[in-house]
Regions:
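Short, glycine-/aromatic-enriched active-site segment of Class I SAM-dependent methyltransferases
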Residues: 144-161
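A short SAM/SAH-binding and catalytic strip from SAM-dependent methyltransferases
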Residues: 107-120
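Conserved class I S-adenosyl-L-methionine
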Residues: 1-41, 147
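A short acidic, Gly/Pro-enriched loop at the edge of an enzyme's catalytic core
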Residues: 99-108
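Conserved beta-strand signature within the Rossmann-like core of class I S-adenosyl-L-methionine
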Residues: 136-143
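Short alpha-helix
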Residues: 162-178
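Class I SAM-dependent methyltransferase SAM/SAH-binding core
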Residues: 46, 52-97
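A short glycine-rich, Lys/Arg-flanked "PGG" loop and its adjoining helix->strand segment in the class I
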Residues: 123-135
Length: 211
């Protein structure tokens, strides 16, 4: 039986190649523009699964916000610290991460970091990220949707086991966690690499209303 790789192993191996293929997904760039329009000056932002730091941390730190990026891949964190010196990066897992900042974040961004988990871990990660959103703040997330449970696949040449939630499961979980969903949509992205086929992407924008 082929040993399945962890997310850290996959992204340590992929490095900047991941950014080359997925670093400028049009809907992700639109999501960043959406959140940037709504943040106050010097906002506190958490980038979950920050990768190389591009485009999320780079764009928001460049706009003057205080950005913290977390990623399970040591190689990605090292690269991000070099490419985006205006943000802070930590090697950390969303399942166990404890923010240093009291009072939460003005924005939590989560672009595709939850797939190499099981469904209960994804649900717990959504709950945790929602809890880090300060009143008046936002959560912007993207993933590959579907009621997927422990599916063994080959992705970018790496054997991994993936899970996900359907669109409705995501929306219900975020609402139960106290967020208001403002917008969501799905789209199809085709990376320019034969090892990465077309992907359905789910984007969701949510907020925690002030009392």
């Amino acid at each position: 039986m082929t040993r399945r790789e962890t997310a850290a192993e996959v992204f340590d191996a992929l490095g900047a190649r991941y950014e080359d293929l997925f670093g400028r997904v049009p809907e992700q760039m639109a999501a960043l523009a959406w959140i940037a329009e709504r943040l106050p000056a010097g906002a506190r932002v958490l980038d979950v699964g920050s990768g190389t730091g591009r485009p999320t941390a780079e764009a928001l730190a460049g706009a003057g916000h205080a950005v913290t990026g977390i990623d399970v891949s040591a190689a990605m964190v090292e690269t991000a610290r070099t490419l985006v010196p205006g943000a802070r990066f930590e090697q950390a897992d969303v399942r166990t991460y404890v923010p240093r900042e009291a009072g939460g974040f003005d924005a939590v961004c989560s672009f595709f970091p939850l797939l190499v988990m099981d469904q209960p871990e994804i649900e717990a990660a959504l709950d945790r990220m929602a809890s880090w959103v300060a009143p008046g703040g936002y959560l912007v997330l993207a993933t590959v949707p579907g009621d997927i449970r422990g599916l063994d696949i080959e992705w970018m040449g790496h054997p991994v086991t993936v899970s996900s939630l359907s669109v409705d499961q995501h929306l219900r979980r975020l609402t139960e966690a106290g967020l208001e969903v403002l917008h969501h949509h799905t789209s199809t992205f085709v990376p320019a690499d034969p090892l990465a086929g077309p992907e359905e992407h789910f984007f969701c924008y949510a907020t925690r209303r002030t009392a």
